[in-house]
């Protein structure tokens, strides 16, 4: 009980500390979905209880659900031809603890370098990287907590930056009712080396989420509130994501999601052209798990995310 209370107090203290932060942060790639399942449920989910290592990147407390010696590989085809790859590996420590390591790489390709008169003077490349360690602990039969430490590096042409960040997660799960509640504070930390003279903030994100499986139907409903420290020029639903899983068997799911902010920000001529809608599916074949997600961002832009996990 004491450890559970400590985790709750720490999360609340960080909530108060970052309420005044402005949305002028760097390392925006940290907001990209790591999990195809989370991406399929609207892009944000911190409360799905599954043996899914990728979900522990969204909420480190969920690492307690992951099997020993799980290896995960991911690939994302993002908007504008941006490519991202990531990997993770987990180990169980005793009855209550689990640890994992992850790596993420985003490649923006080669771009033209031009003057203010649009004269091409050369080319340059840009990339982002993050390396993380995750630890989770079962605080009781219902509560679990987790922490994720991140080493973050970005390089854009002649400019580079290095930062250290921490994610904190807490989850409550009642197995009999199949109800899950989570709180997460992500990207707490700062730059060690700035791009230029002035240090900039990390994209801090406080989230709360719930997931409930229906008792007499093969459906699971999720709702997540995110970016709760920044309410400038935004309404309540701009912070909301909803999603639903169809679970005909224990080894297969189909997901649909909706992100209200994406719809509002990407409207063209009073039409969203399906921006904000997401979909995906997952399949388990023995010790292998496959997942895929599609997300619509704009009339002409979308993304695809693929996960492959296996138990060694």
Give residue ranges: language-model regions:
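Bacterial Sec-dependent N-terminal signal peptides
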Residues: 1-22
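Subset of outer-membrane beta-barrel
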Residues: 21-312
